[in-house]
Swiss-Prot record:
Topology in membrane: Single-pass membrane protein
Descriptive protein name: Cytochrome b6-f complex subunit 8
Gene: petN
Protein family: Belongs to the PetN family.
Domain of life: Eukaryota
Coiled-coil residue windows: none
Amino acid sequence: MHLDLISITWGCLMATFTASLALVIWARNGL
């Protein structure tokens, strides 16, 4: 149960990082 919580938290962190990184790249290409 505890390991699942860590996995979910890490997954959300990576998803947020990937989304923000993609947004920055998209914004630069847009400009």
